[in-house]
């Protein structure tokens, strides 16, 4: 907030005419006024940041509904049939490398079929969200061992959800 605006606010606050039956306003310390202005700016910035995070739709963790992939993306399905538009840069990560290897083992790759990963949509959303943050190699390895590997076992769906909630608490 510019210094002139602070002085105007201070001037308006201290020079308000109050009637005789009302309490007289005390003057706000300029340091306190500056502190309040910074606090309001910080709160406004948090509000803007919150809107951009929840409104972000281009970078990944959303399910894809269009028939054709966006530029720089490919369409990948999960075992429960959900469809995701995945940025091509994610395909070179350790996590996706392991998911694609498991997919090839379980479903096989032919040039004519869709790519299906052996995990549920919730796991895929978590992986996409994590990769958007550009994690370290150690974090990717931890995700592979705690979240991705249990996806390979179809009978252990409860283990996948337990590992997912534990991983969300850790990261």
UniProtKB/Swiss-Prot annotation:
Tissue: Highly expressed in mature leaves and at lower levels in young leaves, flag leaves and internodes.
Keyword Cytoplasm in annotation: yes
Principal location class: cytoplasm
Lyase is among the record's keywords: no
Biological processes annotated in GO: auxin-activated signaling pathway; negative regulation of organ growth; regulation of auxin polar transport
Entry keywords, A to Z: Auxin signaling pathway, Cytoplasm, Developmental protein, Growth regulation
Lineage: superkingdom: Eukaryota
InterPro entries attached to this UniProt entry: SAUR_fam
Stimuli inducing this protein: By auxin.
Compartment annotation: Cytoplasm
Family from the record: Belongs to the ARG7 family.
Note: Plants over-expressing SAUR39 display reduced shoot and root growth, altered shoot morphology, reduced size of vascular tissue, low yield and decreased basipetal auxin transport.
Protein known as: Auxin-responsive protein SAUR36
Organism: Oryza sativa subsp. japonica
């Amino acid at each position: 907030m510019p210094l002139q605006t602070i002085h105007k606010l201070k001037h308006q606050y201290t020079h308000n005419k109050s009637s005789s039956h009302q309490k007289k306003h005390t003057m706000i310390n300029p340091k306190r006024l500056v502190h309040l202005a910074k606090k309001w700016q910080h709160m406004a910035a948090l509000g803007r940041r919150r809107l951009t995070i929840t409104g972000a739709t281009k970078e990944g963790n959303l399910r894809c509904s269009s028939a054709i992939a966006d530029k720089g993306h490919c369409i990948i399905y999960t075992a429960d049939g959900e469809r995701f538009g995945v940025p091509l840069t994610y395909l070179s990560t350790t996590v996706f490398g392991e998911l694609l290897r498991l997919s090839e083992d379980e479903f096989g790759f032919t040039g004519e079929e869709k790519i299906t990963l052996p995990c549920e949509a919730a796991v895929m959303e978590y992986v996409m969200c994590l990769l958007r943050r550009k994690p370290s190699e150690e974090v990717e390895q931890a995700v592979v061992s705690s979240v991705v590997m249990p996806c390979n076992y179809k009978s252990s769906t409860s283990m996948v959800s337990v590992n997912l909630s534990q991983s969300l608490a850790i990261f």
